[in-house]
């Protein structure tokens, strides 16, 4: 089998290596909090097929944005409310397209990765998040 379930914590270096050992991240999710997994993959330059309607990083998904539909959650507990159901027919189309045009997608997403590193500078994000608090005590 070419599927391996990782149940133990892995180091940052192992995580980067995991991304570099694969060609495409396929992430058809109904919803996500921050979305570290696709963001990390995008930051390595990996093409990512992902649901985008809720994603704060949707501007970086480019042509591999996976269509979805806003529906009532099929899991009333503990996830009541609305979710974005991935369009699996569109997922198949995107997977086929990226497999046939991998070099073009790879170049596009590699170019996008520098923009992600600029926008998601953790020190700057932290400073922006807490700046209003720091100003009160200066």
Which ranges hold each PLM region?
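Nucleotide-activated donor-binding/catalytic signature segment of Leloir-type glycosyltransferases, i.e.
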Residues: 1-13
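Short hydrophobic beta-strand element within catalytic cores of glycosyltransferases
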Residues: 47-51, 62-65
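Short glycine/serine-rich donor-binding loops of glycosyltransferases
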Residues: 35-38, 53
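Aromatic "clamp/platform" in nucleotide-sugar-dependent glycosyltransferases that forms part
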Residues: 30
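Short alpha-helical donor nucleotide-sugar binding micro-motif in glycosyltransferases
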Residues: 17-22
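A charged, aromatic-enriched C-terminal amphipathic alpha-helix characteristic of glycosyltransferases
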Residues: 86-90, 100-131
């Amino acid at each position: 089998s070419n599927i391996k379930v990782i149940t133990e914590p892995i180091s940052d270096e192992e995580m980067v290596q995991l991304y570099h050992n694969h060609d495409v991240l396929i992430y058809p999710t109904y919803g996500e909090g921050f979305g570290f997994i696709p963001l990390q993959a995008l930051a390595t330059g990996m093409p990512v097929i992902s649901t985008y309607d809720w994603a704060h990083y949707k501007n970086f998904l480019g042509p591999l944005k996976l269509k979805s539909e806003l529906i009532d959650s099929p899991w009333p507990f503990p996830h009541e409310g609305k979710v974005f159901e991935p369009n699996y027919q569109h997922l198949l189309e995107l997977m086929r397209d990226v497999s046939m045009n991998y070099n073009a997608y790879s170049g596009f997403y590699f170019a996008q990765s520098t923009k992600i590193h600029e926008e998601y500078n953790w020190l700057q994000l932290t400073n922006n998040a807490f700046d209003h608090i720091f100003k009160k005590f200066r």
